[in-house]
C-alpha cells in the first residue's frame, strides 16, 4: 500500500480527477515535446462527458497553449478498458504528422496511471506491508498501538511536517470559504451558503449550534473547491469538505492541538489508502460512494481517534461511515461539482460525527468489517451503470432543468 501522502494532495478545484489529473498529464507531455508545432488531446468516457463542467479543457489548455496550439476532442461515448477517465495526448509536427502519442488515465484523487502495472510511469513505491484493515488492526492490538503509530512506523520522517502543512491548508480553506459570498461560477448560478450558515449557527443554542457550524465548515471548503480555490483532496476534490469540516470543528470546540490533529489525519489517510488500494476513490469508477462515502469513513476514523477510541471502535466508526453511503450515485448537474456534491459534503460531515458517537457507545464489536464493506463498495460500483458514474447522463443530472 502506498503512502498516505497520495491521499492528501494540495491543489486547486473543482475536480481532482477532471482538472488536477489532466493538468498534471498535460504538463508532463508538454515538457516531453517542446518542439511540437501543435497538440491534440482526446478525452474519453467520463472525462469527456463532464469535462466542460469540470473545466478539464481549460486546465489542459493553460499548460499546453504557451508551447503550441492545442485541439481538444471530446469522445464521451468511448470508454477505454482500463478506466473511464482516459485521455490521449498527441504531438504533431508542422505538417500535422504525429510525432508521439500517449494514453493515460486520471484514476481519482489527482493520481495518474498508464495502466501498465509495475512498469507504469506513475507506479508509486509501496510503503506499507499490510493491505487490509483486518491485518493492520491485528498489528495494532498485538503491539498496543493505534493506527497513527502504524503509519508513523512506515512513513518517511517528514510525514508529520507534511500532515501539518495539509492541516494548515485545510484550515485556510475553511476560513476562505467562510469569508467569501456571492455566486459560484457556472450556469447554475448557485449562491454560496457557508457564510450565512456560520452566522445563523452562531446564534443557536449549543445543541443546534454544533451541527450548524459543521455544516458551514463543510460548505465553506466545498464552495472554495467549486470556485477553483486551493483545497486538499481527502480523498478527492469532490469530497474535500468532509474531513476538514469535522477536524476544524473539533479543533475549535475541543481545543485539540495541531499535533493531535495531524495524528488523526494519519489515521484518516490510512483508511483512505486501504480503500484506494482495494477498491477505488474515483466517482467515474464506483460512483459517489467512493468519494463522499470514503471521506465520511476517513472523518469518522479521525474523530473517533481524537476521542480516545480503541482500534476496534475506530474501525467500526469508519465502517459505518462507508456502509451507509453504499450505492450512492455520482450524477453532478451540468457536470459541475456543485449539485448535489456540496450538500453531500455537509451531510457526510455530520454523519461522520454520528458514526463516531455511535461507535463510542459500544466496545467496537460488530458483524460487518470495514474490509468487507470496501469489497462490497467496489462490486456495487462496478454494477452501477455508467449513467450514475460521473457522466451526467442519469439521476439528478438528467432530471434537472436549468429553467
Tell where the protein language model's regions lie, with residue ranges:
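Acidic, glycine-rich active-site loops and adjacent beta-strand->loop/helix elements
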Residues: 8, 43-49, 76-78, 265-274, ...
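Contiguous, well-ordered alpha-helical segments that form the cores/surfaces of helical PPI scaffolds
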Residues: 216, 220, 241-251, 266-273, ...
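C-terminal regulatory domains involved in ligand/effector binding and gene-expression control
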Residues: 66-204, 212-213
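Conserved phosphate/anionic-ligand binding catalytic regions in large, soluble enzymes, centered on
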Residues: 8-28, 227-246, 288-296
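Accessory "access/gating" subregions that flank catalytic or transport cores
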Residues: 161, 171-274, 280-283, 287, ...
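Alpha-helical support elements that line or immediately flank enzyme active sites
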Residues: 19-32, 244-255, 300-308
Amino acid at each position: 500500500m502506498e503512502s498516505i501522502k497520495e491521499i492528501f494532495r494540495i491543489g486547486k478545484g473543482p475536480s481532482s480527477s477532471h482538472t488536477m489529473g489532466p493538468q498534471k498529464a498535460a504538463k508532463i507531455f508538454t515538457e516531453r515535446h517542446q518542439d511540437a508545432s501543435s497538440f491534440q488531446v482526446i478525452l474519453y468516457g467520463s472525462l469527456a462527458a463532464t469535462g466542460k463542467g469540470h473545466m478539464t479543457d481549460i486546465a489542459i489548455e493553460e499548460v499546453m497553449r504557451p508551447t503550441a496550439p492545442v485541439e481538444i476532442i471530446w469522445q464521451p461515448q468511448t470508454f477505454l478498458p482500463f478506466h473511464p477517465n482516459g485521455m490521449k495526448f498527441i504531438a504533431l509536427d508542422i505538417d500535422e504528422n504525429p510525432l508521439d502519442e500517449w494514453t493515460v488515465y486520471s484514476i481519482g484523487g489527482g493520481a495518474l496511471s498508464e495502466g501498465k502495472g509495475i512498469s507504469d510511469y506513475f507506479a508509486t513505491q509501496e510503503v506499507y506491508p499490510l493491505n487490509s484493515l483486518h491485518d493492520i488492526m491485528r498489528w495494532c492490538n498485538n503491539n498496543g498501538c493505534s493506527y497513527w503509530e502504524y503509519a508513523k512506523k512506515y512513513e518517511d520522517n517528514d510525514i508529520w511536517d507534511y500532515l501539518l502543512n495539509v492541516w494548515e491548508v485545510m484550515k485556510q480553506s475553511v476560513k476562505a470559504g467562510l469569508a467569501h459570498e456571492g455566486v459560484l461560477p457556472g450556469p447554475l448560478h448557485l449562491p454560496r451558503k457557508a457564510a450565512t450558515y456560520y452566522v445563523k449557527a452562531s446564534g443557536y443554542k449549543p445543541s443546534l449550534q454544533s451541527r450548524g457550524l459543521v455544516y458551514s465548515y463543510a460548505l465553506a471548503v466545498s464552495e472554495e473547491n467549486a470556485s477553483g480555490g486551493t483545497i486538499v483532496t481527502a480523498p478527492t476534490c469532490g469530497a474535500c469538505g468532509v474531513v476538514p469540516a469535522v477536524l476544524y470543528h473539533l479543533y475549535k470546540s475541543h481545543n485539540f492541538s495541531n499535533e493531535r490533529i495531524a495524528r488523526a489525519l494519519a489515521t484518516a489517510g490510512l483508511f483512505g489508502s486501504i480503500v484506494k488500494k482495494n477498491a477505488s476513490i474515483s466517482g467515474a469508477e464506483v460512483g459517489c460512494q467512493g468519494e463522499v462515502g470514503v471521506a465520511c469513513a476517513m472523518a469518522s476514523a479521525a474523530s473517533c481517534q481524537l476521542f480516545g477510541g480503541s482500534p476496534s471502535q475506530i474501525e467500526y466508526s469508519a465502517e459505518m461511515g462507508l456502509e451507509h453511503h453504499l450505492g450512492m450515485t455520482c450524477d453532478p448537474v451540468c457536470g459541475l461539482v456543485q449539485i448535489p456534491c456540496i450538500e453531500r459534503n455537509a451531510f457526510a460531515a455530520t454523519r461522520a460525527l454520528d458514526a463516531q458517537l455511535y461507535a463510542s457507545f459500544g466496545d467496537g464489536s460488530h458483524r460487518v468489517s470495514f474490509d468487507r464493506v470496501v469489497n462490497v463498495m467496489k462490486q456495487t460500483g462496478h454494477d452501477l451503470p455508467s449513467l450514475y458514474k460521473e457522466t451526467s447522463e442519469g439521476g439528478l443530472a438528467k432530471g434537472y432543468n436549468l429553467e
